[in-house]
Amino acid sequence: MASLNTLPTGTWNIDPAHTEISFVARHLMVTKVRGKFTDYSATVVAADPISDSSVEFTVQTASFDTGSADRDAHVKSGDFFDVETYPTMTFKATQITDDEITGDLTIKDVTKPVTFSYDFNGVATDPWGATRAGFEASGEINRNDFGMTFNAPLDGGGVLISEKIKINLDLEFTKA
């Protein structure tokens, strides 16, 4: 892991071609369903000290993709994201340390604080002269907190879909 102190100050824009925003939910409490969002934007304004930096993400909720058209259509419906009414979800950092970022996550007009742990993987210059920075982050939310409460109880206990959703981010930014 690189030292965050080596991140040059200034504006950094997400590189969607080298980034993945993914999630994991439990299905029937015995297996995992994985998916990702494919349409998003993000900007980091790195400052010194790092605690003065800003981070903002916008994700297009209709870009939700698990590889199952039927499941994706259900999750995009009013039972979950309601993409027609709430086309985006956003994250805005409120506190940044050397290994955690806390911010306001807004889904379906509900805003809750969320903390992600992260690793800064360093800075590199690509063959075309662009300066790039890489991060890995992970966190967890309770989907019920954001009004996504659809579920069904199971005969043996448990529920159809886990309330806790794990979020994983593999991020690459390009210096503006």
Give names to the regions the model predicted.
Residues 1-176:
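Low-complexity, acidic/polar, glycine-enriched regions of mature
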